[in-house]
Amino acid sequence: MAYEYNEEWVPQTRLGKLVFDGQVTSMDEAMDSGLPIRESKIVDLLLPELEDEVLDINMVQRMTDSGRRVKFRATVIVGNGDGFVGLGQAKDVQVGPAIRKAIDNAKINITRIKRGCGSWECGCGLPHTVPSEVNGKAGSVTVVLKPAPRGLGLAAGGTARKVLEKAGVKDVWTRTEGQTRTTLNFAKATYNALMNTGTVRRPIVFDETEA
């Protein structure tokens, strides 16, 4: 079924046209298509329950020939609390436009993470934690996520907790290294760790019959 109520959006990409025409009706289908998401409206239509949260607003300055230029840099996390999460940042001379641009960038950067019950202490089989230990790095910050039993909660710092909540991870152990006071790198490292949940390598099982 095509999206008849969205006359203002004129899709510019192949995936956007497929979504607009109703040929792609879920974010899973969009991800499985192999086509890049380059329009934030795609995410608006496929994940209407998506929530966003501003992680950081910072003022940045740059000297030019005409003098000092000041802009605001916004860092935003978006997620549906059920396996989809995106991180974005943007700059503008005003805070409001910077936030809106960062939200759009976060939607374009949305990714599907893999969840499971990877803790040997649990075994419930529900997708409440990460499937195995993963790590992410950004700048000087390294974040390690470890599977935790159901009911433990998020043993994570403020910025990492917000990213994990938006991704739909309910229980996890974390370990951090580096300057975690830098919100941007802390958020990026956590986000990168979550992205790595989909690229976990399984251990090689040797056939004992081969000798």
UniProtKB/Swiss-Prot annotation:
GO BP terms, alphabetized: translation
GO terms for MF: rRNA binding; structural constituent of ribosome
Xref: InterPro entries: Ribosomal_Su5_D2-typ_SF, Ribosomal_uS5, Ribosomal_uS5_arc, Ribosomal_uS5_C, Ribosomal_uS5_euk/arc, Ribosomal_uS5_N, Ribosomal_uS5_N_CS, Ribsml_uS5_D2-typ_fold_subgr
Domain of life: Archaea
Keyword set, alphabetical order: Ribonucleoprotein, Ribosomal protein, RNA-binding, rRNA-binding
PROSITE patterns reported for this sequence: RIBOSOMAL_S5, S5_DSRBD
Domain S5 DRBM: 50-113
Disulphide bonds in the chain: none
Record carries keyword rRNA-binding: yes
Cellular component GO terms, alphabetical: cytosolic small ribosomal subunit
Pfam families to which the protein is assigned, alphabetical: Ribosomal_S5 (PF00333), Ribosomal_S5_C (PF03719)
Protein's UniProt keywords contain Transport: no
UniProt remark on domains: The N-terminal domain interacts with the head of the 30S subunit; the C-terminal domain interacts with the body and contacts protein S4. The interaction surface between S4 and S5 is involved in control of translational fidelity.
Assembly behavior: Part of the 30S ribosomal subunit. Contacts protein S4.
Free-text function comment from the UniProt entry: With S4 and S12 plays an important role in translational accuracy.
Family statement drawn from the similarity comment of this UniProt entry: Belongs to the universal ribosomal protein uS5 family.
Protein name: Small ribosomal subunit protein uS5
Organism: Methanococcoides burtonii (strain DSM 6242 / NBRC 107633 / OCM 468 / ACE-M)
Source lineage: Archaea, Methanobacteriati, Methanobacteriota, Stenosarchaea group, Methanomicrobia
Gene: rps5
